[in-house]
A protein has these predicted regions:
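Phosphate-binding loop of NTP-binding sites
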Residues: 114-202
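N-terminal leader/targeting and accessory segments in enzymes
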Residues: 1-116, 120
Length: 202
């Protein structure tokens, strides 16, 4: 069981350190293009990826980079940096440039595409876990901890909250209250691999 809270994880150095341990599969770009709402594609789709990223500074060779817009900046501004760090494909809501040096997939909703690809890459761990989400203004952490301890006597559980991420066999500090979907899928995959059957999140 894995506990997921309303304030979930994003990625810190501690979370990024788990990337190599996470059980993710390799996906072909053609497979990705078929499972998301594509507007157009550019370049070769006969390329496999095993890592997805929304921060150009954390791109590693072979990454799929999602260019996501935000309140203060826009991921499209950092496509060149992502390419310099080894990205092999970009997924964005913006049209592909006329001379992109790498593959490019334009979608209607980049965040929806990120969610769909993340679930696919990490083997849809949410389908194999009993998930409990705890929301509210105050008391989420307390309720989550109590719930985990109550159910923990019957099954191995995981907890993803504002204080830390308990993955069943280890505890790491949480960096942010709300995680991006690819980090959440990665953590759920790790919890599942560690033998958890339930997850609590607040």
């Amino acid at each position: 069981m894995v506990s997921v809270s309303n304030t979930l994880l994003h990625q810190s150095d501690a979370l990024a350190h788990l990337t190599r341990e996470t059980s993710s599969s390799e996906l072909m770009l053609s497979e990705i293009a078929n499972c998301i709402d594509c507007i157009t594609t550019f370049g070769c789709l006969n390329i496999s990826v095993s890592h997805i990223c929304i921060d150009s500074r954390k791109v590693v060779p072979g990454s799929l980079f999602f260019a996501i817009g935000g309140c203060l900046t826009n991921g499209n501004f950092y496509i060149e940096e992502a390419i310099d760090h080894g990205a092999v494909c970009v997924i964005s809501e913006s049209p592909p440039p006329s001379h992109s040096p790498i593959s490019y997939i334009q979608v209607a909703d980049v965040r929806q595409a990120l969610a769909e690809v993340s679930l696919l890459l990490y083997g849809k761990p949410d389908q194999d876990l009993s998930l409990i989400g705890i929301t509210g203004t105050n008391g989420k952490t307390t309720v989550t901890m109590l719930t985990k301890h109550l159910i923990g006597d019957c099954a191995r559980t995981s907890l993803l909250g504002t204080v830390h991420y308990d993955l069943g066999t280890r505890i790491i500090p949480s960096a942010r209250t709300t995680p991006e979907v690819h980090d959440l899928c990665r953590l759920l995959s790790l919890a599942k691999a560690n033998g958890c059957s339930r997850d609590y999140n607040h």
